[in-house]
């Protein structure tokens, strides 16, 4: 199973933001979408989530055209999305945040508590289960949001699209999130990450796409991109180290 963008184009008036971009994410792999500011990566990412619609091109889930499906319809097909902005309910506890999502799913009520207990343990949130969202740390908030994304649907998502998952958290929390994302890949969840923390993202991706001026400049493994002279010239710079 894979998500694929095929020759997507997005313009605002006469200005092309994304031009004929194609990329794919399969289950069980972590894919990065990176590039300098203004490269079009955020718009491309939003086209993948359903927050933006392309002027041309298409988005596919296997052989199903999902180009025009809004984000909530894609969620029902197993495509989860983690926004950059904090999305925990600040005046609910961590457990209540998970319960609220569980109530919207097809999971039988009798299974709610066991599913929530599993997610709390999986994301190391047991100690803050009864803490209000407004009181948790940045790393705990991010882990709560990831756990909540996995609570959607009876079987959980097939794909997770992560927008700046490393933003606003300290180095220890970044390491924890990297480990969690790697475990999700091991569970055959396909993950697309866009983030300004380049080194932290390339450390866990199986492959990545680098964008420049609305197009794909290069793609490949972290090592391939690191040694690509165009990527170093336009994005990483000469002093970048993996």
Where are the model-predicted features located?
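Catalytic Walker B motif of ABC-type/P-loop ATPase nucleotide-binding domains
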Residues: 160-164
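Conserved ABC ATPase "signature" region
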Residues: 64, 99, 110-128, 182
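The feature captures the beta-strand-to-loop junction immediately N-terminal to the Walker
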Residues: 34-36
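ABC ATPase NBD coupling module
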Residues: 53, 65-85, 109-113, 129, ...
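Conserved ABC ATPase signature
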Residues: 132-140
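Helix-to-loop junction immediately C-terminal to a conserved catalytic motif
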Residues: 49
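ABC-type ATPase nucleotide-binding domains, specifically the catalytic core motifs of the NBD
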Residues: 13, 31, 69, 92-111, ...
């Amino acid at each position: 199973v894979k998500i694929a963008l095929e020759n997507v184009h997005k313009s605002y008036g006469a200005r092309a933001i994304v031009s004929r971009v194609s990329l794919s994410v399969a289950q069980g792999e972590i894919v990065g979408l990176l590039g300098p500011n203004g490269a079009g990566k955020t718009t491309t990412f939003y086209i993948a989530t359903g927050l933006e619609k392309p002027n041309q091109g298409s988005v596919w889930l296997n052989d199903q055209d999902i180009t025009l499906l809004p984000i909530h319809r894609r969620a029902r097909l197993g495509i989860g999305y983690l926004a950059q902005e904090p999305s925990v309910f600040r005046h609910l506890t961590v457990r209540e945040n998970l319960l609220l999502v569980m109530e919207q799913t097809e999971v039988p009520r009798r299974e709610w508590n066991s599913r929530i207990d599993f997610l709390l343990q999986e994301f190391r949130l047991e100690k803050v289960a009864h803490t209000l969202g407004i009181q948790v740390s940045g790393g705990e908030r991010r882990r709560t949001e990831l756990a909540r994304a996995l609570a959607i649907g009876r079987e959980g998502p097939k794909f997770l699209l992560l927008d700046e998952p490393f933003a606003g958290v300290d180095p220890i929390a970044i390491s924890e999130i990297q480990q969690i994302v790697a475990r999700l890949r091991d569970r055959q969840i396909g993950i697309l990450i866009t983030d300004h923390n380049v080194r932290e993202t390339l450390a866990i991706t199986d492959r990545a796409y680098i964008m420049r001026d609305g197009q794909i400049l290069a793609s490949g493994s972290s090592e391939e991109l690191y040694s690509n002279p165009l990527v170093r010239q336009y994005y990483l710079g000469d002093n970048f180290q993996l």
